[in-house]
Swiss-Prot record:
The keyword Cytoplasm does not apply. It comes from the Eukaryota. This is Pyruvate, phosphate dikinase, chloroplastic. Its cofactor is Mg(2+).
Amino acid sequence: MMSSLFVEGMLLKSADESCLPAKGKQRRTGDLRRLNHHRQPAFVRWICRRKLSGVSRIEFHSGGLTPPRAVLNPVSPPVTTTKKRVFTFGKGRSEGNKDMKSLLGGKGANLAEMASIGLSVPPGLTISTEACEEYQQNGKKLPPGLWDEILEGLRYVQKEMSASLGDPSKPLLLSVRSGAAISMPGMMDTVLNLGLNDEVVAGLAGKSGARFAYDSYRRFLDMFGNVVMGIPHSLFDEKLEEMKAEKGVHLDTDLTAADLKDLVEQYKNVYVEAKGEKFPTDPKKQLELAVNAVFDSWDSPRANKYRSINQITGLKGTAVNIQCMVFGNMGNTSGTGVLFTRNPSTGEKKLYGEFLVNAQGEDVVAGIRTPEDLATMETCMPEAYRELVENCKILERHYKDMMDIEFTVQENRLWMLQCRTGKRTGKGAVRIAVDMVNEGLIDTRTAIKRVETQHLDQLLHPQFENPSAYKSHVVATGLPASPGAAVGQVVFSAEDAETWHAQGKSAILVRTETSPEDVGGMHAAAGILTARGGMTSHAAVVARGWGKCCVSGCADIRVNDDMKVLTIGDRVIKEGDWLSLNGSTGEVILGKQLLAPPAMSNDLETFMSWADQVRRLKVMANADTPNDALTARNNGAQGIGLCRTEHMFFASDERIKAVRKMIMAVTPEQRKAALDLLLPYQRSDFEGIFRAMDGLPVTIRLLDPPLHEFLPEGDLEHIVNELAVDTGMSEDEIYSKIEKLSEVNPMLGFRGCRLGISYPELTEMQVRAIFQAAVSMNNQGVTVIPEIMVPLVGTPQELRHQIGVIRGVAANVFAEMGLTMDYKVGTMIEIPRAALIAEEIAKEAEFFSFGTNDLTQMTFGYSRDDVGKFLQIYLSQGILQHDPFEVLDQKGVGQLIKMATEKGRAANPNLKVGICGEHGGEPSSVAFFDGVGLDYVSCSPFRVPIARLAAAQVVV
């Protein structure tokens, strides 16, 4: 009786359930082929017809170009029976699947899935992320029993391959790769060709040719030395460049077998010179050290920085994938490539990738050589190319997403080495989502989940205002690796890019090629330019994931890091010179070119309409001018949730002088005279905003900041001189007034409703301007929905006082102008006490709007102006997980919001509740606001689409 056992989500099959090789003459392609390192490998046809638990059949037919076909039935949920740390895959069977990413990492889970659906995947084993976690907890040593489990998995691979690690007569070489649950391109380590030593390379040379064998050996020595032993790659690269110069060749592929054999000896000497120890020749020791190195790379500075930048938390560690090697460097019938099943930059439904003849995969991914377009493969390896195209279709249909695929062709045989969901730009993400809905692959709710909020952020980035205007300034053209436009000053190191960014400067990071260590500078830079590397190089993949403009593989440039100069022909560009990049065309442009805001595409409008159909939360905008209001409306805002009246005061010298006269006034009469000068300015601005928001609510906050913010900046003598000119007062009078205005802690002082209560004429002027503008616009056919918001309320009595002033002025204006209209009066909840007594305040207010910026400030006791002195220390030490001014503190500030909402609605069931801090555009905060039942969020105009999508993703 055959048995099947479920273990932690895998289907483990008994030996007699495995597919057996059919006898007889074999025919080409579409078959699952046994990996073989010989020059003339035998093709094997596998036919598996036995019914398995949950799998009806997996068929692989030989002959013609018929692709593998898999017919899968759903498997019932597995029952955990034991803790397993090593999972094997290959030959049409796997101990894992695509849903086990948290345990096997993305790479391991997808290798298992590809093998199980019948694609040609070299057999291997995956060490789980939980094993990595145990390794870290065990003092960075392999936990007890794990090495034996790895060797057991290795025996499976050796049996599948009829080859052995360290056996010169039947050599088995391995790749050792990382793979976390969330893709982190280039951040962790890889070792290829593991298992080579002097004896094994001689055996491999006898079977596969000396040049191939010694090329593989020198690559292994370089990679193992760098990744495992910590020897700088540059030490090996120097030897390679010296050898090429000595032999008078330009390419690695032009070196002979004898040259490479000599290079191997030089590489072995590098170990002794750099580390004082010899290269380890025992293959099993090599494997143990490589596994340790991959586990160690999880905690490397570059990996930690990447996770910090991308806010990746909660992962156990990286998995380790050990796989038998297939070789793309066995001559002109071999090669390696990376592709995306659709264009990751534009979303176009067309294979997008690169291919290198006679090369290994790291040459493409690391950007060491600039590869050819994928189309070259169709010409030189047509059968393998056709199989690859068919595999891409299978994977897209299976995963229902755009896939990123690594593959190798060994002597015209295609092998699939990796697949994962492809990283894409904002433009690409939206088009792929819309196209896949139109193709019937996914539904609109799935599409909403496929586009990340940061993708929309990228789409809102500027482009060049007039590309035709800079054509005469184009000095070089590289590969358009990541779209968009970037303008900045040239820097030549990641550290300088971070430093310049911290100083508020826009930097263009220029490198010969980027490495994972550059990740901090890449994130800080406005754009990235590299001399080497293709569209799938490290720089390109990381930049696209961030929506960062990148031009790669620009062969016309020469980078001198030591001299900090960039040479293009006879032109020299120094550090600090201005450069512009067009990541959509690959153009490198001299000088500082003008940027223009982006426009919504038809695909984006379609996509956002799907998001709007499902979201519950309304999305408003914080807008202070008519132009801001128009931008907000064009971005889909459903009204203005915060219009800050004080920003209007800085629009001209006349306005600010009138404000200063009001501040310096001694008597109410003087103050009223100054306010009368301000009223027409305010009224005009409100008219423009009401016109822009025709038919949508506009929430106007009365004056909030402390008065000292409107005084001139500079030393006291300068301030007094300027105020004397502006107000006509004597210097003594001004000194006296400044002394009275000075405060120890202005943000907790004389501001907000305290100003309106102390100077009612200030509230009266602003309210009169609001209602005069509203009636005037109404008379012109504009539908006006005004809402007046009283700031910094901490007691119901404060709000009651201001409401009395507001309603009195409204009645007077309506009587004067012969028209009445509906309006609302509410308050900001930004003082913790207001949240605690929300039921009392709700009896006075028609709406609450949480000012989360000040509410966070007062709840934590952090001054926003001073928090930078310690915030980075708190974040780096884990005292805080996020900047609370960017990501809402849900346990503290969030609970005040939840409590105030519940109390307020209990006292006033018709109470409208929203939030108008910048947290309104932050996705995790938006999810919280939806969960506690707020009616709307309000954020900056450019973040409105992000908030719309975040509100929809909460629902789906």
